[in-house]
């Protein structure tokens, strides 16, 4: 089944294999414009039914790592254009993953020296890379975040929408909103991090308010069936705390996305066993709640494991990462 084609109302993929988004850090940090190395990297992997790009920051303050190609200005969009053209020439399809790192960042990564943005002021007990005195990358603790104001939150929503518009201009077939892995949108979802007492904190609906505002703003620029949203149930990457009620949280979001006609729900579980663990028990609930395509990602070590999830109807596409970058 994994080599069967897949289509929705807007897109057709040659097979059900998606190349998972993987940060590669191959751009120049100054302008964050994709280069020839990035073009060749994606062109070589265009046999995937769908390529989901590495995370592309939607603004300078959205950056959390050195040398990531971005998508907040015309020059960056122009840099992505030959990349998407190369993928299309090989028969592939490509989504841009829109990314705001939030507190997983450092002031040294931002041109204006601004502090990392966060749902709250709770600092991440993890590290990132910043330029050293000699210009070479050095590891350092993530910086102290500042809790976003309501006005700044509105700005973040606008940044995602603008990046989505640029993605279409650059020739991407769609976009993925990165709401997983402990980055900004996931930070707002997490009750252990989000201690806000305004419209963006407290209840589940409030904690997902930012993500859904981003979804709605992006859907004004990109057809909903060309939009994916990534989530990471049970995820604890980047100093996150596991959701206390995952079987409530994620089906709730799936229903909201379904109501909006979103095309893809991307579920990532790091190094998991999709056949036997808790993620497996969640998939029927997600399928009931969401009628678009479900992408399953994480821990697929064999073709048989991929086929099993497809055969059970728990997913429509399988996203894999390491096999696309391992040595032959």
Give the residues covered by each predicted segment.
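Flavin-dependent oxidoreductase catalytic cores
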Residues: 1-328
């Amino acid at each position: 089944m994994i080599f069967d084609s897949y289509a929705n109302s807007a897109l057709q993929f040659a097979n059900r294999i998606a190349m998972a988004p993987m940060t590669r850090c191959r751009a120049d940090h100054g302008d964050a414009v994709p280069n020839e190395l990035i073009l060749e990297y994606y062109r070589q992997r265009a046999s995937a039914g769908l390529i989901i790009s590495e995370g592309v920051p939607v603004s300078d303050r959205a950056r959390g790592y050195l040398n990531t190609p971005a998508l907040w200005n015309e020059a960056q969009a122009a840099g992505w254009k030959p990349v998407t053209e190369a993928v299309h020439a090989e028969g592939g399809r490509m989504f841009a993953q829109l990314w705001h790192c939030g507190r997983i960042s450092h002031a040294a990564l931002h041109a204006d020296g601004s502090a990392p943005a966060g749902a709250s002021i709770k600092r991440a007990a993890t590290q990132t890379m910043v330029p050293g005195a000699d210009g070479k990358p050095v590891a350092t603790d993530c910086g102290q975040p500042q809790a976003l104001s309501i006005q700044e939150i509105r700005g973040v929503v606008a940044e995602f929408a603008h990046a989505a518009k640029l993605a279409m201009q650059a020739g991407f077939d769609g976009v993925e909103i990165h709401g997983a892995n402990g980055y900004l949108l996931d930070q707002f979802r997490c009750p252990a991090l989000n201690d806000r007492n305004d419209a963006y904190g407290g209840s589940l609906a409030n904690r997902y308010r930012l993500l859904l505002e981003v979804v709605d703003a992006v859907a004004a620029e990109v057809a909903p069936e060309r939009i994916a949203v990534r989530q990471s149930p049970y995820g604890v990457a980047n100093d996150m705390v596991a959701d206390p009620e995952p079987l409530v949280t994620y089906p709730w979001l799936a229903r909201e996305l379904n109501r909006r006609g979103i095309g893809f729900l991307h579920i990532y579980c790091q190094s998991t066993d999709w056949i036997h663990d808790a993620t497996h028990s969640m998939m029927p609930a997600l399928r009931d709640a969401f009628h678009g395509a479900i992408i399953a990602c994480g821990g697929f070590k064999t073709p048989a494991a991929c086929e099993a999830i497809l055969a059970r109807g728990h997913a429509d596409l399988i996203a894999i990462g390491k096999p696309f970058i391992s040595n032959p």
